[in-house]
């Protein structure tokens, strides 16, 4: 079987592809030979690399692909055109799972057999200079994954109060110098509003102490992460998406989460771990009806990419992977 191809000129190597298949494949084939009758959600469709692999390997699988980026949906739908009779594409954030299932004619709970969340910024968004996600390239400060709605990163920088800027830098970027950076942003925008990434990167080089710059990675990394999360309300969307995804799984269904930073992984863990434990009072000789664990965790903590995977696909280096299988009906 062929590996996923490039699409629309964008080189795209799906992250942890074969590990995702190891985890999700058994749930797909348990429904029927070749995945006949099985439904999978790709909650972060992107360029469709993961989806192309699963559709190619499991000829009976129907895939529901979600993405908030209209350009990504266009490219993915073209890429997956050979599977048009087994795909449903929905323009939505990943917390729009319930609406996506309705469009596919499925109930919102216990109706799908595999779900993949490949979180963070897509390869295409990083590689498109004019999107403003990459601090290594001077570009308009947009950072919207869906460019049809919402504030841009420039508008956040130019309109937010000192307190709000410091809050998002500290909370979403875990930036030690959040207050100092916020003060410099306010001073600079009084002279000239922010429009491109180069001006922000220059400010961060000036503001973050030299000793920290030498040891803490690129000085813009945390601020750009914080702005991206704020602009796209990523964590709010994820907090709604994780329970919606878990609820959508049928008994025997499996889910894989790939997080690219600790904030995402904490959200996933906070929802997944409690639902994998019994709620029966301690000391009882038997499990009370409806109080047993809903899920079985399939990974030991958060798995990381192997050295070989990172060498072949450097974008897999920060990934934290968690997976689980539904083992009982939803709790009341």
From Swiss-Prot:
InterPro entries: RsmH, SAM-dep_MeTrfase_MraW_recog, SAM-dependent_MTases_sf. One of its GO terms (molecular function) is rRNA (cytosine-N4-)-methyltransferase activity. One of its GO terms (cellular component) is cytoplasm. It holds the Pfam family Methyltransf_5. Its main location: cytoplasm. The keyword Cytoplasm applies. GO terms for biological process: rRNA base methylation. S-adenosyl-L-methionine binds at residues 48-50, 67, 94, 118, 125. HAMAP family: 16SrRNA_methyltr_H (MF_01007). This is Ribosomal RNA small subunit methyltransferase H. It comes from Rhodococcus erythropolis (strain PR4 / NBRC 100887). The lineage of its organism: Bacteria, Bacillati, Actinomycetota, Actinomycetes, Mycobacteriales.
